[in-house]
Swiss-Prot record:
It is found in: Cytoplasm, Nucleoid. HAMAP family: NdpA (MF_00730). One of its GO terms (molecular function) is double-stranded DNA binding. The lineage of its organism: Bacteria, Pseudomonadati, Pseudomonadota, Gammaproteobacteria, Enterobacterales. It comes from Klebsiella pneumoniae subsp. pneumoniae (strain ATCC 700721 / MGH 78578). This is Nucleoid-associated protein KPN78578_25800. Keywords: Cytoplasm.
């Protein structure tokens, strides 16, 4: 699938001391040559594979106002990117953890959808071996570990302004303060909560199976069906469609799954992004804490794994051979 770059600009923020971030602005746009296209394709791939949160612009968002003017042809893309980088520097300066980086703005098209991607990338040093087998220093953009990135679906934003999912951003690993400063710069707030939608789906599936009075084996088969469909959508980069999922579960009950969720008021969207970590709960139980990590297939509950809620005790019958071997060696050694 081809990625077509419309316009791309790079600027830089350099941290000179604890108080100041120096602004270095390009005087021209980047030429979208083969190297630039390859870089953007890699950034698009890395970003698309990561878990994202969804948002929308606030009414007073300066970035949204400037972007709207740029899209209407009242401002050049380069001028838009330069002004936005200045606002980013001002926002970053409020935080003691502020670091510099390469600031990227790229307007591109992928699969007939227009996007604006904004990222702060680290420019790192490394070593390479040249053709004479000498070691030389080199610099590279750390795209694989990019975590300050947001992407606006311009097509969705302009055709469906009431949407709560046209803006996506990375959330989690970078920490709340970093996420907060970037959201402040974007002038955005969280919109669709994909995790909540997936949790609601899991609850609806269990309730649907219970309403159909399925036995344990049948309930687990339903969960497996749902997981298989959702995982297929996830791998294809597609959203979970309630109507399609309902067709997958046809025959489970006289009432369709889509009808059941609507009647019971689960407030599920007609389509929403799949969340990998939440969906795993359909087929596995997992948890960790206090030096203990446990992970087992859901079908084993009640067969080899038993939980007593009164005493909060988990009993496992038949330990994995490698674990049993470790336990035997440790206990036989008297330690």
């Amino acid at each position: 699938m081809s990625l077509d770059i419309d316009q791309i600009a790079l600027h830089q923020l350099i941290k000179r001391d604890e108080q100041n971030l120096e602004l270095v602005l390009r005087e021209s746009l980047l030429e979208p040559n083969a190297t630039v296209v390859e870089m953007m394709a890699e950034l698009h791939r890395v970003y698309s594979a990561k878990s994202k949160a969804y948002g929308l612009f606030n009414e007073e968002s300066e970035l949204a106002q400037a972007l709207r003017l740029q899209r209407q042809g009242e401002e050049e893309f380069l001028a838009f990117s330069r002004a936005a980088t200045g606002r980013l520097r001002d926002e970053l300066a409020k935080y003691p953890f502020a670091e510099g980086g390469i600031v990227l703005f790229c307007q591109y098209r992928y699969l007939a959808v227009e996007y604006l991607l904004v990222a702060v990338l680290n420019n790192l040093s490394s070593m390479r071996v040249n053709e004479e087998l000498d070691i030389r220093s080199t610099h590279y953009l750390d795209i694989n570990h990019a975590d300050i990135v947001a992407r606006i679906d311009l097509t969705e934003w302009e055709t469906n302004p009431e949407s709560t999912r046209y803006l996506t951003f990375l959330k989690g690993r970078v920490g709340r303060k970093v996420a907060d400063f970037f959201m402040d710069f974007l002038g955005a707030s969280e919109g669709l909560n994909a995790k909540a939608q997936n949790r609601g789906l899991l609850q609806a599936v269990d309730d649907f199976a219970a309403d159909a009075q399925l036995d344990k084996s049948e309930r687990q088969n339903v969960r497996q069906q749902v997981y298989a469909y959702c995982n297929e959508q996830l791998q294809a980069g597609e959203e979970i469609e309630l109507e399609s999922l309902s067709k997958e579960l046809a025959g489970v009950s006289e009432k369709s799954f889509q009808e059941f969720t609507a009647e019971q008021g689960y407030e599920l969207e007609e389509s929403f992004p799949a969340d990998r970590s939440t969906l795993r709960q359909l087929t596995k139980f997992a948890g960790s804490g206090g030096g203990l990590t446990i992970n087992f297939d859901a079908m084993l509950l009640g067969e080899r794994v038993f939980w007593d809620p009164a005493t909060d005790t988990l009993t496992i019958k038949g330990t994995p051979p490698n674990l049993r071997d470790q336990l035997q060696r440790r206990t036989s050694g008297g330690n």
